[in-house]
């Protein structure tokens, strides 16, 4: 396992009410409503953010709007590189909290 995989797995175990799942074939965190709140993608995390959190995450060096396929950006989803792993938990918590409020 890479350091990113180890950290992401630890976060799954630390954050109440999330479970491991899959999104686009990658490890993700599923909230109680069955929706993905965060995903591990090529040793980066991908989180759904809005407003100030979205802008702050995009301001991190190397972060970008997530594109699962080139030219197909996902609105409000940000890909954050492992170099910012100290910030991962805060963004995962914001994302999972917001996603858990969405309807099934």
Please give the residue ranges for each predicted region:
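Charge-dense, helix-prone N-terminal extensions
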Residues: 1-104
């Amino acid at each position: 396992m890479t350091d990113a995989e180890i950290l992401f797995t630890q976060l799954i175990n630390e954050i109440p009410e999330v479970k491991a799942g899959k999104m686009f074939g990658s490890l993700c965190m599923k909230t109680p409503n069955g929706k993905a709140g965060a995903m591990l993608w090529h040793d980066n995390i991908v989180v759904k953010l809005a407003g100030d959190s979205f802008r702050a995450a995009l301001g991190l060096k190397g972060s970008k709007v997530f594109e699962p396929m080139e030219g197909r950006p996902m609105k409000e989803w940000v890909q954050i590189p492992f170099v910012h792993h100290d910030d991962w938990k805060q963004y995962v918590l914001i994302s999972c909290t917001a996603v858990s409020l969405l309807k099934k």
